[in-house]
Amino acid sequence: MNEVMVIKEGWLQKRGEYIKTWRPRYFLLKSDGSFIGYKEKPDSTEHSLLPPLNNFSVAECQLMKTERPRPNTFVIRCLQWTTVIERTFHVDTPEEREEWIIAIQTVANGLKNQVPEDEEEEAMEVKYGSPSDVSSAEQMDVAMSKGRPKVTMNDFDYLKLLGKGTFGKVILVREKATGLYYAMKILRKEVIIAKDEVAHTLTESRVLQNTKHPFLTGLKYAFQTSDRLCFVMEYANGGELFFHLSRERVFTEDRARFYGAEIVSALEYLHSRNVVYRDIKLENLMLDKDGHVKITDFGLCKEGITDGATMRTFCGTPEYLAPEVLEDNDYGRAVDWWGLGVVMYEMMCGRLPFYNQDHERLFELILMEETRFPRTLSPEAKSLLAGLLKKDPKQRLGGGPDDAQEVMSHGFFASINWQDVTERKLSPPFKPQVTSEIDTRYFDDEFTAQSITLTPPDRYDNLDALESEQRPHFPQFSYSSSIRE
């Protein structure tokens, strides 16, 4: 095994991702492609001991020189875990910039043919350029029985539009063979590729396939056509918590406790499987027909996070971003407990803990402002929210090695039997008044009133004959599993 060497080191000015200020960072570029930044210059013995503020890989990177927003700026476009990121740096002279660019490019070129065989399968390697340039190393371990008939668009009746987003739409469908109802998420490949969301989408598919928990949305099938990816998921027709809270303005503490407990149970399960959710927000929390929580939309999940492991990709809704994300630092599982704090604050207080239409001001509030609580809150609720919304992730409730157990043992949840939570034995405080599987009263009629337009079915007739090499971005995407076991 080759010894990892420091190829180049020195001070760089790095631009913040959200708060666009320049911060001095001492960076080390190593022969294994790691590009790590520290607040202070570490001495040689500290390299492996000090936790870095920034940790990137220059493998498969692209480099760009620019004189904006400052002279002698360069941008690195690279893969951070499974997401394509861009980071902006600035130095004092053109010569210094050239030295860094040559060093980074040399390391990146040297790594091109050195991917170990055992890592090749796991690396979801996103390359840049035209679709044909994308490596088929973007693979997913899909346990799929070979004898099972393949699923196509023709296997479903398309009933109602449930939602629309940047990448596609969600439609209420009925499986023709069984008469069962599902939510089908249809994503347009060209948009996913254009917006560098390939890795996020593959992550969503893999997380959905490998998780089974009462409060996580189950995946029934995943398949693709020539231009679309389709997830056929459990259909939760109780509506988004956002929908209900926006109509009721505030929930009682008991009701918030119930939803909070089910979210904690789901996060404990994900964290135990080394998955950090990262995008807890009301819009991603659905209710099923009985009133239990279903967490949806796994596109922002980051896989492979263990205690103490951190990640450096930017995603999430601005109002829900944790301070450590804004401060441009590595972050770990504690971001989910911050997210829980924000949604529980919304439920019990009827507003976001920090809000401003101006994002720069919003980020300032998240970083600096003390959390304020209405006088109507109980001491236990106040204590829980204050703990979850601690700025320092190490001090945050749930931020220690015990993770979810810290949250579960808080006084606010003293009345909760956690075994009963997981077994769905607690009575939901609100039961959606749905009269049938196709009752969409809790979905926005902005969508449900629209007619569904799909490409004519004959476009899909022979798509399952496509070989994986004709699908360079999404090989082995298909999946089939019984939700109702």
Curated annotation (Swiss-Prot):
Domain of life the protein comes from: Eukaryota
Keyword list, A-Z: ATP-binding, Glycoprotein, Kinase, Nucleotide-binding, Phosphoprotein, Serine/threonine-protein kinase, Transferase
Regulation of protein activity: Two specific sites, one in the kinase domain (Thr-313) and the other in the C-terminal regulatory region (Ser-478), need to be phosphorylated for its full activation.
Ranges of compositional bias, category Basic and acidic residues: 458-472
Annotated ATP binding sites: L162, G163, K164, G165, T166, F167, G168, K169, V170, K185
Modified residues (Phosphothreonine): T313
Domain PH: 5-109
Residues annotated as domain Protein kinase: 156-413
EC number: 2.7.11.1
Entry-listed glycosylation sites: S132, S135, T310, T317, S478
Record's function text: Akt2-b is one of several closely related serine/threonine-protein kinases known as the AKT kinase, and which regulate many processes including metabolism, proliferation, cell survival, growth and angiogenesis. This is mediated through serine and/or threonine phosphorylation of a range of downstream substrates. Over 100 substrate candidates have been reported so far, but for most of them, no isoform specificity has been reported. May be involved in the inhibition of ciliogenesis.
Protein name: RAC-beta serine/threonine-protein kinase B
